[in-house]
């Protein structure tokens, strides 16, 4: 996958390209990240990249000419088929379904805003999609862009040690993930659930699914409303709810 990044601070993306899963993906040639800074497309000695908004008000906007020139340079490098994405609080909220959708692209250009944002006409003429990572404000689009790259890269074949890892992540099937345990078997008088030590793969799968359903019901119940549960899932959720309510009564 090829990703172009438009940013005033491209060095921030070393967190993606030099470390962890995404760093290995870059090293192994599975992920290619290139950068264009609007500062490199300025023509004044101060390398100005911000400008005052029409109508007044606090803050500045990114200057149109350097930003557009940077986007055009990235488009030329990408060739045909690259989607241009602006990271913005006004965009569609990124979720696992959206990540899967974005992962089908072989080429993306991510535009990271700064200051109070970018000119609306640039959005209309240069941007294909707007995406947000949540209903809050950050200082720029770099962190959302890194979040998007990390989440999408997990779906590139060969990036994860076991491709099933991406399929079993939280939200992969619309549910939160189940609890996980590793050694030691007993930690401060707390045991690993016996079923996980049984070697019975059918029962382990059933337990994990029930815990996933139950955890979603407890922590993110709104997610269940958008799902069409199977008969098995409905039974397991009801079973979890009975067990949970029984435990609460004991306390």
Curated annotation (Swiss-Prot):
UniProt catalytic activity: guanosine(37) in tRNA + S-adenosyl-L-methionine = N(1)-methylguanosine(37) in tRNA + S-adenosyl-L-homocysteine + H(+)
Broad enzyme group: transferase
InterPro entries, A to Z: Alpha/beta_knot_MTases, tRNA_m1G_MeTrfase_C_sf, tRNA_m1G_MeTrfase_TrmD, tRNA_m1G_MTases_N, tRNA_MeTrfase_TRMD/TRM10
Record-level GO cellular component terms: cytosol
Protein name: tRNA (guanine-N(1)-)-methyltransferase
Keyword Manganese among UniProt keywords: no
Organism name: Pectobacterium atrosepticum (strain SCRI 1043 / ATCC BAA-672) (Erwinia carotovora subsp. atroseptica)
Biological processes per GO annotation: tRNA N1-guanine methylation
């Amino acid at each position: 996958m090829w990703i172009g990044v438009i940013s005033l601070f491209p060095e921030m993306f070393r967190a993606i390209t030099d470390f962890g899963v995404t760093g290995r993906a870059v090293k192994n040639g599975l992920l290619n990240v290139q950068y264009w800074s609007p500062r490199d497309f300025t023509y004044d000695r101060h390398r100005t990249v911000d400008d005052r908004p029409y109508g007044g008000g606090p803050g500045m906007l990114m200057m149109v000419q350097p930003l557009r020139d940077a986007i055009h340079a990235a488009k030329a490098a990408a060739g045909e088929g690259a989607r241009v994405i602006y990271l913005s609080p006004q965009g569609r909220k990124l979720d696992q379904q959206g990540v899967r959708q974005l992962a089908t692209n072989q080429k993306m250009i991510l535009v990271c805003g700064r200051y109070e944002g970018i000119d609306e006409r640039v959005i209309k003429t240069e941007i294909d999609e707007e995406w947000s990572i949540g209903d809050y404000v950050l200082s720029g689009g770099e962190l959302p862009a890194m979040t998007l790259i990390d989440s999408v890269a997990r779906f590139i074949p060969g990036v994860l040690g076991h491709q099933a890892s991406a399929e079993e992540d939280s939200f992969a099937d619309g549910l939160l993930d189940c609890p996980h345990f590793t050694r030691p078997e007993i930690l401060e008088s707390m045991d690993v659930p016996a079923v996980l030590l049984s070697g019975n793969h059918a029962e382990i799968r059933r337990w994990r699914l029930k815990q996933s359903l139950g955890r979603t019901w407890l922590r993110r119940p709104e997610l269940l409303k958008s799902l069409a549960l199977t008969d098995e899932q409905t039974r397991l959720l009801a079973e979890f709810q009975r067990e949970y309510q029984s435990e609460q009564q004991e306390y």
